[in-house]
Amino acid sequence: MMIPWQDLAPETLDSLIESFVLREGTDYGEHERSLEQKVADVKRQLQNGEILLVWSELHETVNIMPRNQFRG
């Protein structure tokens, strides 16, 4: 189920994004990016509709995924 990120309290959204960024461990190439930069990147992608917040009823977790991978 898709979660409208705009409906979340800003602190909740930040916590979800930080948790996602910290567990992803994505390689950003030669230059490491700060947590704040990574969070800002994810927020921008949410605002642009490139990615979605998704609730998994099976796992009872929230995840962030590319829009084109969501099958709801």
From Swiss-Prot:
Transmembrane parts of this sequence: none
Any Pfam family the entry gives: UPF0270
InterPro entries referenced in this protein's UniProt entry, alphabetically: UPF0270 (IPR010648), YehU-like_sf (IPR036685)
NCBIfam families (alphabetical): PRK04966.1 (NF003438)
Family listed: Belongs to the UPF0270 family.
Official protein name in the record: UPF0270 protein Ent638_3781
